A protein has these predicted regions:
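Extended amphipathic alpha-helical scaffold segments
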Residues: 24-38, 67-74, 101-105
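C-terminal helix-coil-helix/basic helical segment that borders enzyme active sites and/or dimer interfaces
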Residues: 60, 64-96, 103-115
Length: 146
């Protein structure tokens, strides 16, 4: 049985993950085609810079983690509470990946992708609260309380 909150959260997580992937791809293309190394570095190309390489690796891990959590949330056949917690984790991981991509894109290229509108979305900090209260105190998410 589906729950509207779970469906909404899965859609939000999928959108953020898609935007994060697109942003990473834009960043990679920019770095490969237009990026310039720092003037005082010992590299000929920005794509050889260990700092840049590490940043890209970090982003890829965040995106892969978000994708795995989203897939788990989409396929989980558990109680509504388990499914809602899984979708909350996917929302958090996807938002984290998107924000990290946006920050690194700005840091390395000077550009920013336009982030999705937050209108109609629950504040991200609220998802941490729901997840933490569930893990720490065993409290069911408020969306499931009657």
């Amino acid at each position: 049985m589906s729950h509207p909150t779970i469906d909404t959260q899965l859609a939000v997580a999928a959108e953020d993950l898609s935007d994060a992937r697109r942003g990473l791809q834009q960043t990679l293309e920019y770095l490969r085609e237009q990026g310039q190394p720092w003037a005082f570095s010992d590299v000929q190309s920005i794509v050889e810079d260990p700092y840049v390489i590490g940043k890209i690796g970090d982003l890829q891990i965040r995106i892969d983690l978000a994708a795995a959590l989203l897939e788990r949330a989409q396929t989980l056949d558990g109680s509504p509470e388990q499914r809602l917690i899984a979708s909350t984790e996917a929302v958090i991981a996807s938002a984290d990946a998107l924000l990290a991509v946006d920050n690194v894109q700005h840091e390395l290229t000077g550009q920013r992708q336009s982030l999705p509108s937050q209108a109609g979305r629950e504040p991200l900090h609220w998802h941490y609260q729901v997840l933490g209260n569930h893990r720490l105190n065993g409290v069911a998410p408020p969306q499931l309380q009657e």
